[in-house]
Every structure is written in structure tokens, then in C-alpha cells.
UniProtKB/Swiss-Prot annotation:
NCBIfam families: PRK13505.1
Record protein name field: Formate--tetrahydrofolate ligase
E.C. code: 6.3.4.3
Similarity field: Belongs to the formate--tetrahydrofolate ligase family.
Organism expressing this protein natively: Cereibacter sphaeroides (strain ATCC 17023 / DSM 158 / JCM 6121 / CCUG 31486 / LMG 2827 / NBRC 12203 / NCIMB 8253 / ATH 2.4.1.) (Rhodobacter sphaeroides)
Amino acid sequence: MAVQTDIEIARAARKKPIQEIGAGLGIPAEALIPYGHDKAKVGQGFIRGLEGRPDGKLILVTAINPTPAGEGKTTTTVGLGDGLNRIGKKAVICIREASLGPNFGMKGGAAGGGRAQVVPMEDMNLHFTGDFHAITAAHNLLAAMIDNHIYWGNALELDARRITWRRVMDMNDRALRDTVVNLGGVANGFPRQTGFDITVASEVMAILCLADDLEDLERRLGRIVVGYRRDKSPVYCRDLKAAGAMAVLLKDAMQPNLVQTIENNPAFVHGGPFANIAHGCNSVIATRTALKLADYVVTEAGFGADLGAEKFFDIKCRLAGLKPSAAVVVATVRALKMNGGVAREDLGREDVAALRRGCANLGRHIANVKGFGVPVVVAINHFTTDTEAEIEAVRAYAAGQGAEAFLCRHWAEGSAGIEDLAQKVVELAETPSMFAPLYPDDMPLFEKMETVARRIYHAHDVIADHVIRDQLRTWEEAGYGALPVCMAKTQYSFTTDAAIRGAPEGHSIPIREVRLAAGAGFVVAICGEIRTMPGLPSQPAAELIHLDEEGRIEGLF
């Protein structure tokens, strides 16, 4: 019998009306703004009324360094949420929205997989409720107003060479990384060099995901630094009077999206910054709403714990005042073998020796999460090629690192395949969490970058030229020294070289560029060759996506 694809499983799901899902959380129908029958936004008025309620337990799902195909972190997040509900706990899932770039590129969608999916899967992986389009429009409105201001006399005296605000689109397109705009003569403005980033790297995306409410959203938008004058003094979004119009475009996008899992459990899907080039977490407003409505909230942070979890702890939890109760590190036998030196085409063959070598990567991530004072458990996301000897080797290694490991079959079995992990998470969440960020607010910006590099990546030093160091000092003098840092680097390694696997020690982290995200409230350090506008692979997933003769989508995964 052929194995069903994710899209076939999702289509066969028996979805409940979204009002019924909301009612299970105590959300009245009038507080929902429906987008069809199976998805809705939760109104701001209802969310404001939740203030004062006690919070549930916050559970983070993170992972080891992934293979290019991902290791099922979202699948495990969904499965764990279903598993908690299965054992009688009131649980909600909080995940990010999907970007079109990876969907048509290499990684695929962001709705989970197998029997642990959020539905409607096709909508979620495409336009969903239009949030990303609103973010793209708001971002590019500001870009248009910058060039328009210069065209009509440049009263703010913006230096065209020092405009830092680029344009965005939600697609992988390397051709747009560096562009020249305003060509074509006097009628089109003053030519200047700029470029595009992918929408998920936009500061507007980060602002939407970190803002408390609409008022905070507009205030943060106004704080965006768009560029500098000749005397190097900053020009803000509020100086261009753009923040109000941007907030109008984002008004509906600020409301969290409610959907359901295949097993009809509630899921908030809202926001979608990448963890390698941004802070990698779903929105604060969705997480806070879920914490007021459920006893357990299961959320994820992008890629491995060196990126997503570190930013979840040091940026999201710090800025939003959140305190996680437990963390799950997702590992797969195939990724551990890859970290142990096995080629991608050989990952289906048993190799316990390589697996044990690769387990050093798992150990590093366990230690890093423990370093934040959060209790840890390991989820072994099962693949059919795993052998019993390999699974036992992972269990034994994790136990030696002080973390229990559970084999999870949620992809194939749904919540029934992850009950043991759910029980353990409940147990861990009842133990005291000694959560604390990695560094204090008052540490200098460059020292914060060094702290992340040395303690999380185990680097020997951070390489940054005097221009970067001077820029950081200038920002500190301007009052931005207390901001956390957001390290943008490859997700495949603790180094900036994607080919170096395992748990390397003593390497250097080169910082190529720094960017001030004053509205979001952090400083970005772009490390190595990471790009904020990805490119498509030689054989993009888009080549396999099409409509069948009945108009149904095929090839989406």
C-alpha cells in the first residue's frame, strides 16, 4: 500500500468549523473574524479582555543542526500539542506562518507533516490570511516614501549613499540582492544602489511579531531607522510620517490566526521570521493569547537551538517577559549521522559509529539549552530507515548528557505515537525553571556578540573590522546599547561554514555587517556568507508544483 503524502493526509482530515475550535478555548464566535470555514483571526478586543488571567506553561520545541530537508521540528511541535491534549491537558500550539520562498525552493512548507499537521495545509503554505502580503506592502510603502521624499526636495537631508532601508518580497530571488533604482532620467528620481531582502527578514515582520498591540506596533514602526544624513545623524520612519499608514496596512495582520490540527486541536499560526537571518519566533501576541487560554502552550523556534532557541530566549522572552517551563530538543538519526560525516545519499544505511560521532552535536545543543536554566528532554523523530541499534545509541548518549530521550512516531501515528514525550513534558514543566537570558542588557553590543559566539557556538573569537566596531559604539552612544543581538548565520553548523558539522571548537565567527533594527529592538550581526535574500536551488520545488485536471494543487509538501 502506497504511503499517503502530506497533502493527501491533510485533504482527508475531518475539520471542525473554526467557531467550534474557538469555543473549545472559550473564544466566542463574535470574537472571531472568519476567513472561510476553517481559519479565523482573533479580535483585538477579545485579546485585551484576557489581561489579568494566569498564564499556562510555555514549552519550547527546538532541534539539533538540521539536514537541508529539516528534521520535523514543526511536526514534533504539532504532535506534542496533540499528545498533550490526548493525555487530558488543555494545550495550544503556536507556530509560524510559511514563507513562499522555501515552499517553492527547497525546504517545503511549515504546517508539519504526516499525521501531525496543521490544516488547511494548502492555504497555510500559500497565501493563508494575507499577513505576509500586508507586511510586504507596509515595508515597501516606507521604501517608496523614502525615494519620494528625496525626489521632492529631500527636506530631511537624507544621504542617498546611507539609506539602509531596502525593499522586500516573499520569494527566493538572488537576482534582486543588489539593485540600482531610479534609473531612466530626471522624471524617475536620483539613481542609487539598494537591494531586496526576503519578507521574513524584514524589520516590519520582526516588529509585528514583537509588538504588544496596535499602539505599540505604530510606535515601533516610527522608531525604524531608514538611513542617515551626511553628518551621520539618523532619519526615522516617523520623520517621513509613514508609520500611521504602515500601521493601517498591518491592522488586520496584527490579529493572530486560529486554525486546527488534523486531530482538531487549536493552533495559533502567526508571524514568520526566519531564524537564520532574523529572530525565528512566532508573534508575542499569539503566544500571550495562547498562554491565557490554555494550560500548556507548545511553540517552536526556527532551525537548531544555536539559532532559534538562543533568539527565543535572548530576544523574544527577554523583550516580552516570557518564562519557558521546559524545552524539547528534536533529533533525528539521519541528521546525527550527517553530523558524524555520512554523505546525504548514504543516510538510509545503518552506521552506529558515525551516529555516535554526530551525537556530539546533540550534546552541544542539550548543554546550550540547559545553560539558560530550562529543563530539557530529547525527542527522537522516527524515520522508517532508523534501526534499533541507532535509536538505542541516541538514548544512551542523551542519558549521559542528563536528558531523557523518547522515540516519537507522531508522523505515522499522530498523538498516539508521542504520548510518552507528552507525559515527560508535563513532569518537566512542574519542576522549577531557572530561566535567565545569556547576557545582561548593559553588556556592550560587541561583547554580547562575543558571548553568543563563545558560549553557544564555542568559537574562539569574533572577527569584526574597525568600521563595524565603531558603528556599534556609535549606536551605544545613541542609546541602543541595551538592545539584544540577533546573529544571522548558517543554520547547518555551529560555525559560519555550512560544511563543518558536529560540534567544532575554537573557530572564528566573522561579522560582515551589522544592522540596527531600532523598531524591533535588536541589533543584527550578519556573519559569514549568510544572505538576507536567499536564492533558489538548481531544482526548485516549484518545478513539481502544479494543478491537476480537477484544479487541485499537487506537489506541495
